Design a protein with these regions (language model features):
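Short amphipathic alpha-helix with an adjacent loop that forms part of the alpha/beta core around
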Residues: 115-119, 412, 569-571
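A phosphate-binding catalytic loop at a beta-strand-loop-alpha-helix junction
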Residues: 128, 402-421, 527
């Protein structure tokens, strides 16, 4: 150890290793491109090429990494842009104008792409409960999946002569590949949204834990693996299997970087064990022995004058400090060996680190009962996650102002848990729920009660849980949420050549905004295009008899017609950072140019755009 210390203190006679530094820089941007080599870490150049290419890059070089048929397509899918947008649904929202919480309906792959600019490095906690790939619950089939027969050949389950190489390939091969191809791009996009000290928790079971661990190692980096916790999900075992009854599942935890520090948790304390025999003003305490075999050896004097030489837990300086602070207790009227005090109030404040065995959290059966009570004893969801599980995760990994994302939100347990946490510590955590509006089968109770898709139940769960928390605690927190739906772009597609249109169609294209789109639709797309959070406060007011929208202090927009110099002079007094008009808002190009020049003259900091 001494030699190592000397080597660290000694100045290196060589210049710094630029190759290693470059590898470190690349690992921050593309941790999945870091692999093992004979002499340490190296770059997987084929994978790096794929990250930087819009086309599929071929390569067959052997290396240590997880491969499956369709992986390159999955990487390409994560990197490819989307032409979709989000549309606000005010009537379905709660406190739309004031809330900072979001509920987004749509395919989470597209939604994650849309959120990349607005929420880049802003999400502190991600919790997801994705499909476990049991063979029954797979719903996210992306359009980049390769042909099934082609996969059998690529994966070695068939050769070019159509001969089967392993048994039962129809269920064994594509089964895992589809799941991996679904998860990979979503996790890759999710990582971009995490803060530098951000963290992700993923619920999973034995079907894919091995594969999930490998792709998370690749996407987040092996150094950012925090834990694989085991959670008891059943209170009683089911005797449905031939061998061992499974009563657990996993929660895989990764950070974005080494900056992540989890909060300590409140310890379980039996307060009856804490006493205060000497009326210490700091309150009740328990004592622990000061002796420790192999520790520092010295002599102490008890309160009765007895001298004791022992091997102690503390250095003599620490012992004297504890003694001066009246933290040493001598039993048997001062004759016994010293013990140090651990005060109840200090124990509560300090907290403890969590471990990997989570057995004190509610079971899935208890969570089902909890949700049934919320919906007047009606069963709409099978085995939702317990609120106290997600609440524990939120408490463990967030502070009061953080943003929490769940892009497989299901029944919106995460939203419920975030509101619970805020009610306890008066926090202002924000949630973003993303859920595919999966249709509900007509024979189910939920459908008969008027719920046509899962999203409708989820939103109602947030409303009901919010009302319950408010009634139970009277906490002054954000109970609202803005609803957005994934949809096609607000702009008409104009990929055809001009000769492909007739004159009447060309006249319509002068205004390329789809006729069914509202001002709120356009405003939302502008917020996203400019990389602003969807939770910003939106106000409206009139300027020269024209309606103007103001998004915080970041963006002004007016979609009325006949924008002129008079309007420009008045709006310039607001000194907007950005202002947007429709291209058709101006009578002609000269009018548009005049407004732009006038704004530049009267408000030089204003950036003007048209759509």
């Amino acid at each position: 150890m001494k030699n190592n210390t000397k080597n660290k203190e000694k100045l290196d006679s060589q210049s710094s290793n630029l190759i290693n530094k470059n590898i470190e820089l690349i690992s921050e941007l593309f941790p999945n491109c870091i692999t093992e080599s004979l002499d340490g870490q190296s770059i997987d150049f084929e994978l790096l090429k794929q990250e930087l290419s819009k086309d599929i890059v071929d390569g067959n070089k052997e290396r240590y990494r997880l491969e499956w048929p369709g992986k390159r397509e999955a990487i390409l899918s994560a990197n490819s842009p989307t032409n979709k947008t989000l549309r606000p649904i005010r009537d379905d929202s709660v406190d739309f104008d004031t809330t900072e919480n979001l509920y987004i309906e749509g395919d989470n792959l597209e939604v994650l792409k849309i959120l990349q600019e607005s929420y880049l490095s802003k999400i502190k906690l991600i919790y997801i409960d994705p499909p476990y790939n049991t063979g029954k619950d797979f719903v996210y089939k992306d359009n980049f999946n390769i042909d099934a027969e082609e996969e059998l050949i690529d994966s070695g389950q068939k050769n070019e002569y159509n001969e089967r190489l392993v048994s039962n390939p129809d269920t064994a091969g594509r089964y895992h590949s589809d799941w991996l191809s679904m998860m990979y791009p979503r996790l890759k996009l999710a990582r971009n949204l995490m803060t530098d000290d951000g963290i992700i928790f993923i619920s999973i079971d034995d079907n894919e834990i091995h594969n999930l661990r490998k792709i998370c190692d690749e996407i987040f980096g092996t150094n950012n693996f925090i834990a694989n916790t085991v959670r008891r999900r059943r209170l009683s075992q089911a005797n449905l299997t031939k061998n061992i009854s499974t009563i657990h599942e996993y929660i895989l935890i990764y950070s974005k970087s080494s900056k992540t520090v989890l909060n300590k948790i409140k310890p379980k304390i039996d307060e009856s064990e804490y006493k205060n025999p000497d009326n210490d003003p700091r309150g009740p305490y328990v004592t622990m022995p000061c002796t420790n075999k192999g520790g520092a050896k010295y002599t102490i004097t008890t309160t009765s004058g007895k001298k004791i030489e022992e091997e102690w837990r503390f250095k003599i300086e620490t012992y004297k400090k504890l003694e001066a602070e009246n933290r040493i207790f001598f039993p048997r009227n001062g004759e016994g060996k010293p013990r140090y005090k651990i005060f109840l109030n200090e124990k509560k404040e300090k907290g403890i680190l969590p471990n990997t065995w989570w057995d004190s959290i509610s079971s899935n059966q208890e969570a089902t009962t909890e949700l049934k009570k919320l919906f007047d004893d009606k069963l709409y969801f099978d085995f939702p996650k317990p609120v106290d599980l997600i609440q524990f995760i939120v408490e463990l990994s967030t502070n009061k102002e953080d943003i929490v994302l769940d892009f497989f939100s299901g029944s919106s347990t995460t939203a419920h848990a975030v509101m619970n946490c805020n009610s306890v510590d008066k926090g202002n955590r924000k949630f973003i729920m993303v859920q595919l509006p999966e249709k509900i089968e007509e024979n189910l109770i939920a459908y008969k009660d008027g719920y046509k898709n899962i999203s409708q139940i989820s939103k109602e769960r947030i409303r009901r849980s919010g009302r319950k928390i408010k009634n139970d605690t009277n906490a002054k927190i954000d109970y609202g949420f803005r609803v957005y739906q994934l949809d096609s772009s607000n702009m008409e597609e104009t990929n055809l050549k001009i000769q492909d249109y007739n004159q009447s169609e060309l006249d319509l294209l002068e205004n390329n905004i789809k006729p069914d789109r509202t001002d709120n639709d356009l405003l939302t797309q502008l917020i996203l295009n400019w990389g602003l959070p969807l939770s910003l406060k939106i106000e409206s007011f009139e300027v020269e008899a024209k309606l103007v929208y103001k998004v915080a202090n970041s963006l002004y927009a007016c979609f009325d017609d006949d924008i002129d110099e008079k309007f420009a002079k008045t709006i310039a007094k607001e000194k907007p950072l950005r202002i947007v008009f429709k291209d058709s808002s101006f009578k002609n190009d000269n009018a548009k140019s005049n407004v732009k020049q006038l704004l530049k003259q009267l408000s030089p900091e204003t950036e003007m755009k048209v759509i």
